[in-house]
């Protein structure tokens, strides 16, 4: 925690930030890596440090604040575009936030920096597979997703 070094970043803080990354990316029609890269390590550390208070705000306000603060722009990627032949259900932004939070948590060593792990996970090629809701990757067990991350592919 950059503001209170004696207070550790919790899994709930990580989950909130991953959820907001997903929500912001969907709102802007961007891939989640775009949001992560625009924030960068310092901003991710800040967001993780203040997640305990940010979760009290309306999520739409957090999206608007991130959009302004980090100069985020709209794109043309629609993660929610699915093929009805394969699935009829789109996971919620909270569900996908939890998927990414578990993955980030699983690869972060004890006492490690969640911001570094967020940057690493979201830059991984497996994110394109997780974010393809026509596949089953997003609802695979966490240990399978971690193995895929470590192997660089599903």
Report residues per predicted region.
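N-terminal interaction modules that seed assembly of large macromolecular complexes
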Residues: 4-66
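Substrate/cofactor-recognition hotspot
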Residues: 48, 57, 67, 74-76, ...
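Surface-exposed polar/charged interaction patches
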Residues: 27, 42, 69, 102, ...
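A structured, charge-rich N-terminal accessory region that forms the first stable segment of a protein
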Residues: 8-11, 86-99, 104-107, 112, ...
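Long, compositionally biased
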Residues: 53-92
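Intrinsically disordered, low-complexity and often Lys/Arg-enriched segments
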Residues: 1-4, 71, 153-154
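Glycine-rich, aromatic-bearing surface loops/beta-hairpins
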Residues: 120-154
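Short, surface-exposed acidic
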Residues: 29-37, 73-80, 110-115
